[in-house]
Amino acid sequence: MRAVIQRVRHAGVDVDARTTGAIEQGLMVLVGVAPDDTQTRADKMLHKLLGLRVFSDEAGKMNLNVQQVEGGLLLVPQFTLMANTTKGLRPGFDGAAPPAHGEALFDYLVAQARHAWPYVATGEFGADMQVSLLNDGPVTFIVET
C-alpha cells in the first residue's frame, strides 16, 4: 500500500459536481493498493496516518499528529500511484490491485479509520474525481507499508 500524504489547511473531493468528502485542517491522503496488499498492511498504514507527527506544536516544531490537532483525514483512492514508469513513456499499471481487491482494501482502510477517528472523509473508488486542496507548508510525504 502506498500513500501520498499532504498536510492541508482544507481539502475536498467532488464527483459529478457533488462533494463526496471535505475536511478543514488535516491530512489529504492519496491511497494506492497493490495486488499483494493485505488488511495488515492497511492497519499499518492507518497507524502511520494517525500517528505521523507533521503538525506544529507551540514552539513551531513538527511534533503533533492529526488527532492531537483534531484534524480531518481525507482518504482518496488513486490506483495511478502504483504505476510503473521505469520503461518508456506510457505508465504501466500491473502494480495496481485489481479493482475488486483495491476497492475492498480501500473500504477496509476507511472503515478502520472511521472506527479510530471521527473526522474521516473520502473520495469515491473508481470515480473521476476533482480534488482541491490548500497545501500547508507544503508538507508532503510518501509512505509505503
From Swiss-Prot:
One GO biological process term: D-amino acid catabolic process
Domain of life: Bacteria
Gene Ontology molecular function: D-tyrosyl-tRNA(Tyr) deacylase activity; Gly-tRNA(Ala) deacylase activity; Ser(Gly)-tRNA(Ala) hydrolase activity; tRNA binding
Motif Gly-cisPro motif, important for rejection of L-amino acids, chain ranges: 137-138
Leader sequence segment: none
Enzyme Commission code: 3.1.1.96
Compartment(s) where it occurs, according to its Swiss-Prot or TrEMBL record: Cytoplasm
Assembly, per entry: Homodimer.
Function: An aminoacyl-tRNA editing enzyme that deacylates mischarged D-aminoacyl-tRNAs. Also deacylates mischarged glycyl-tRNA(Ala), protecting cells against glycine mischarging by AlaRS. Acts via tRNA-based rather than protein-based catalysis; rejects L-amino acids rather than detecting D-amino acids in the active site. By recycling D-aminoacyl-tRNA to D-amino acids and free tRNA molecules, this enzyme counteracts the toxicity associated with the formation of D-aminoacyl-tRNA entities in vivo and helps enforce protein L-homochirality.
Domain notes per entry: A Gly-cisPro motif from one monomer fits into the active site of the other monomer to allow specific chiral rejection of L-amino acids.
The name this protein goes by in its record: D-aminoacyl-tRNA deacylase
